[in-house]
Amino acid sequence: QRQMCIRDRVSAAISAAGVIVLLTAPPTILTGVIVALLFALGYGLDSADGQVARVTGASSPAGEWLDHVVDSMRVPTVHLATLVGFIRFPEYFSASHTTDGFPGGWILWALPMAFTVLTAGHFMSQVLAEQLRKNRKTAAPSTGGNLRSFINLHMDAGTLCWIYIFWGFGVIFVFVYALLFLANAATVLLSMRRKYVTLATPASSPSQEA
């Protein structure tokens, strides 16, 4: 358990280093590469640690709690750091390369703010739905299998990590980031609707199934 805690701290520290670089360094191609690598490494360590814990049965309530806490802060922090970058360098991320050009000002800033809200809402939706299913007799969710996993690759935190490769390309990053937001928003809305329906549907009893 102690080793798992240490690995969680290392993963969080690497992700934090990526956030610090994003906050302090100018938006160059090199900055984007460094940030993407740090984010991907931090996420990869966290994901691998979780897989090992599940396979070996070494997971514990404390470890699972810590993992969820770190995850709940990691992605929103990335979006907030992106917001700071947009505020600090509006002329770099604007299509017209001016402080008041499109998409500049509040129009540009609204994107990471909306992404932060979407991420927080989706995380709460996932965790709360899981807990409610454990405590109440509701219909089981559909799994969707490997096809759904492939279709939902844009929802994976690893995808978010790697788009920062484009951080040094200004408006191209904004375009890719906006596309990722729209794809995530559509998927989250569908996911929330599906969860609401399954939670509102009582589980079938053996007599009903017969």
What is each of the regions a protein language model found here?
Residues 69-210:
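A feature for the membrane-embedded catalytic helix bundles of lipid/isoprenoid biosynthetic enzymes
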Residues 61-69:
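Membrane-interface alpha-helices at helix entry/exit sites of multi-pass transporters
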Residues 2-5:
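Short, small-residue-biased leader/transition segments that mark boundaries at the very start
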Residues 7-62, 79:
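Membrane-embedded alpha-helical segments that form the functional core of polytopic membrane enzymes
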